[in-house]
Amino acid sequence: SVASCLFALCMQSCFQDMDHPAFDYPESTGEVPTTPLKMYLPFDEEDIRDKGEWGFLVADNGNAKFAEDGIAGMAYQGAENAYILAKTPSILENNMPTIGDLTVAFWMRTTKNTSAQGLFSIPNSIKFWGNFDIFLENNNSETQAFFKVHIFNQTAKENDERWVEAKIDDIFGSEWVHLAFVYDGNTSTITVYRNGEG
């Protein structure tokens, strides 16, 4: 299983489990906050609530587990059938360029994966793939991770969809690694940083 501070933002309307009715989310105001930290999940005391400025409504799907030896306190421990779901504000659903620059950063400690894992997604309610998706693919390496990032609705009209691949050394093992996926809204490019180095 993956022991990490990973989370996934998924659109709840993609599925409906009749044993677990749909979440009762309030409507988004449609206004983009001006503060830089939109979402923050520190997982203190096994708390999955968002401490960022947007106050995403976060729910546990699959009985979330936590590890006590996180980089600073508790860490979310993902599993095949357990993930965190945060309701995406309507402002983010179908128009990626309006948010400008975006950084998704987290600490991760995991062993080598044997199948693809979804790490993060800003969904798109019109298309199959989301506006911004991060996947950890199987790379057949004991230490090097293979990330695939999907970007949709970029600024270049002739190329509305793009996949970016990044192979990053020294990810798997017993040490915590800080990863940052930085999206530049002006150029529609992604840069991946490992422990601050690109």
Describe the predicted segments one by one.
Residues 43-46, 107-113, 122-123, 137, ...:
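Solvent-exposed strand-to-loop "edge" motifs in beta-rich extracellular domains
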